[in-house]
Amino acid sequence: MSIWVDADACPGVIKELLFRAAERTRTPLILVANQPVRVPRSRYVRRVQVAPGFDVADNEIVRCVEPGDLVITADIPLAAEVIAKGAHALNPRGERYTTSNIKARLNMRDFMDTLRASGVDTGGAPAMSQRDRQAFANELDRFLTANR
């Protein structure tokens, strides 16, 4: 089992939690981005830099992910693709995407895209809070404990 990170948009505080978890559990952690990402020296952590472009990092994750792997992403279409391949998906706020909820999340995302395209200001996600960080850490720990 490996952890894949959609690293371009992943908050730094979440990456730090992931670095520590990878070391603690000796789990391979791969950060995929189309720009340079700093990672600690570790036998468990590596980065993959892909060419710039829309969805290039996402496509690399989908290409490489295996059933049972965990993908960290806030990108709902990416989450849907990796779930379809038998992997797991967790967003940086600690919400697990599953076969039970991913269709509803995709529908809501598409609806919000339609609203934005028609000129409606839908706002954005609130800033990452301590509660979000804790929710992520807790869900990551639950996943790693259950999947060792």
UniProtKB/Swiss-Prot annotation:
Signal peptide boundaries: none
Pfam families reported for this sequence: DUF188
CDD domains: PIN_YqxD-like (cd18720)
UniProt feature coiled coil, ranges: none
Domain of life: Bacteria
InterPro entries tied to this protein: UPF0178
HAMAP family per record: UPF0178
Similarity-based family: Belongs to the UPF0178 family.
The name this protein goes by in its record: UPF0178 protein Mlg_1612
Organism the protein comes from: Alkalilimnicola ehrlichii (strain ATCC BAA-1101 / DSM 17681 / MLHE-1)
